[in-house]
């Protein structure tokens, strides 16, 4: 079982869907064991569908305030996980002034789904949520009392 990093940043393009979901999932799974934040190349208000699908699993995203990489100038992270190609480029720039690991998890942007059917759109968001949940559990395993 690998040790948890002390600080993780999840990053995507707008900090309105993917990275806030990942941040909230990581906090849900690991609580205060790890400092977790999220950012985007640009910022946009939290997406209502993201709030809805996270609420389905008992995680509240409604209070999320979007940030950009520029808002993180004084923060330090052990690892930056990028969820979009655009965020990957920004993370590489960030590592010029911060020695940290960068991982790219190519993650679909569900806000690009065009459908009049709300359930089709929600299913796309659920798919991203569930993929992020599994990826985070695989990369940062949750320790049970038997593991200690």
Model region roles, listed by residue range:
Residues 75-98:
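Mid-chain, well-packed structural core segment of small domains
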Residues 2-7, 72-83, 125:
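Cytosolic catalytic domains that perform sulfur/thiol-centered chemistry
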Residues 90-148:
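Phosphate-binding/catalytic loops
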Residues 1-71:
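Conserved active-site segments centered on acidic
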Residues 38, 63, 82, 103-106:
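Structural signal for conserved beta-strand scaffold positions within catalytic alpha/beta enzyme cores
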Residues 55-58, 82-85, 102:
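Short, charged low-complexity intrinsically disordered segments located at boundaries
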Residues 15, 54, 80-81, 132:
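Conserved small-residue
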Residues 43-45, 87, 109-111:
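Residue-level detector of flexible, active-site-proximal loop/helix-junction positions
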């Amino acid at each position: 079982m690998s040790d948890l990093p002390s600080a993780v940043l999840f990053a995507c393009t707008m900090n309105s869907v993917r990275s806030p979901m990942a941040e909230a999932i990581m906090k849900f799974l690991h609580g205060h064991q790890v400092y977790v934040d999220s950012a985007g190349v640009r910022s946009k208000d939290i997406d209502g569908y993201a709030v809805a699908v996270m609420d389905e699993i008992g995680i509240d995203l409604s209070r999320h305030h979007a940030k950009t990489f520029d808002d993180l100038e004084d923060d330090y992270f052990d690892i930056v996980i990028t969820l979009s190609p655009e965020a990957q480029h920004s993370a590489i720039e960030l590592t010029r002034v911060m020695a940290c690991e960068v991982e790219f998890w190519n993650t679909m942007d569900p806000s690009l789904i065009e459908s009049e059917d709300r359930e089709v759109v929600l299913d796309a968001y659920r798919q991203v949520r569930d993929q992020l949940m599994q990826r985070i559990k695989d990369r940062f395993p949750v320790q049970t009392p038997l593991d200690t």
